[in-house]
Design a protein with these regions (language model features):
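Acidic/polar-rich alpha-helix caps and helix-coil junctions
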Residues: 1-62, 83-325
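C-terminal/domain-terminus segments
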Residues: 59-76
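Signature of lipid phosphatidyltransferase scaffolds
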Residues: 75-84
Length: 329
């Protein structure tokens, strides 16, 4: 952290969308600031891709953007308000389909598709980044309106570069990036000491928190105390938000020994009852709803202690008898 070789990707020209473009950075045509991969000092170790010699080989954008990949209400509720405080789902305004995206951590809009917005993909990409009528006409999703699944859809990893053939996206995949170093540090200090100083928060967690949220208050000990928050919860929240859709979540839940509480929860979606979704998504009327009027996508889930363990390969169990062992059930 003190070496200075790496830094968070936050070009001023990309403003509050810098986080989004980090994950789809290819050549100068992949973002409105004409930045290429040499401008990314955040990735430490990556799986490199190139459109000519080593493309990704799978059309991630087309398979994800507005498609059958769903996000839960649990995740949507974790994004902070722009004032740095958690939302209260019982009192938050959900009347219009885009209300819950307003005045939130900007990463929510960088990661999730907002109803009513326009999105570009490989089958309808950006032309000149002007947002003019011609570019909007070329968009793959105009006036996006969720009408399947749980109603939340991601657009992280979805390229906006025009004319990308199927499977030819070529942005790099981060195996470890500087943001992970920062948040590992914050969590490790807190877990070691049972507390963390404002100085340590300033050089770690608050850098990711404020990358595209310059007006959001810092997370400090006074802020936690004044707002009756829990520091461990906020550190874990920041990690969950920052690493959304990067395959960290299940390992984190196991590491924190909270999977037994989190995994059995119902998978719920948008609040449908009593909102404009009733008019905009009438086909969801048959879907089961919970007490808040939210779509229930899946229930009756369970978690057993054995799920904390990695499976034992059956071919490694054959040579020796393990009948004397008692495995968790």
């Amino acid at each position: 952290m003190a070496g200075g070789a790496f830094e968070l990707f936050a070009p001023q020209e990309l403003g509050t969308e810098a986080y989004k473009y980090l994950f789809i950075l290819e050549n100068e045509k992949s973002n409105p600031a004409s930045i290429n991969k040499t401008g990314n000092k955040e990735y430490i170790f990556t799986r490199r891709h190139d459109p000519v010699i080593n493309s990704i080989g799978f059309n991630i954008t087309q398979g994800r953007l507005g498609n059958a990949l769903y996000v839960t209400r649990k995740m949507a509720n974790m994004y902070l308000q722009s004032n740095g405080l958690p939302i209260n789902p019982q009192t938050w305004n959900y009347t219009k389909v885009d209300d819950e995206y307003k005045n939130r951590d900007n990463r929510m809009n960088n990661q999730l598709m907002v109803p009513g917005q326009t999105y570009w993909g490989t089958n309808g990409g950006r032309i000149d980044w002007s947002g003019n009528a011609a570019e909007i006409a070329n968009a793959s999703h105009r006036n996006f309106m969720p009408q399947t699944g749980m109603g939340y859809f991601p657009h992280k990893w979805c390229s906006e570069r025009d004319g990308v053939p199927t499977g030819m996206e070529a942005y790099d995949f981060p195996i470890i990036r500087y943001a992970e170093v920062l948040l590992n540090y914050a969590e490790a200090v807190f877990e070691r000491d049972g507390q963390i100083s404002d100085e340590d928060l300033a050089i770690s967690l608050n850098l990711t928190r404020k990358r595209i949220n310059s007006e959001m208050p810092d997370l400090t000990n006074d802020f936690v105390t004044a707002n009756n928050l829990d520091m461990r919860t906020e550190i874990r929240r920041e990690r969950t938000i920052e690493f959304f859709d990067e395959n960290f979540r299940i390992d984190d839940l196991k590491r924190w020994k909270t999977a037994e509480d989190e995994m059995p929860m119902n998978l719920t979606g948008v609040k449908w009852k009593g909102t404009d979704f009733e008019n905009r998504w009438p086909d969801a009327s048959f879907k089961e709803k919970d007490g808040e009027g939210c779509i229930i996508h899946e229930k009756g889930r369970n978690w057993h202690e054995k799920h904390y363990l990695l499976p034992l390969p059956t071919d490694q169990l054959k040579p020796v008898s393990y009948t004397h062992l008692t495995l968790p059930t």
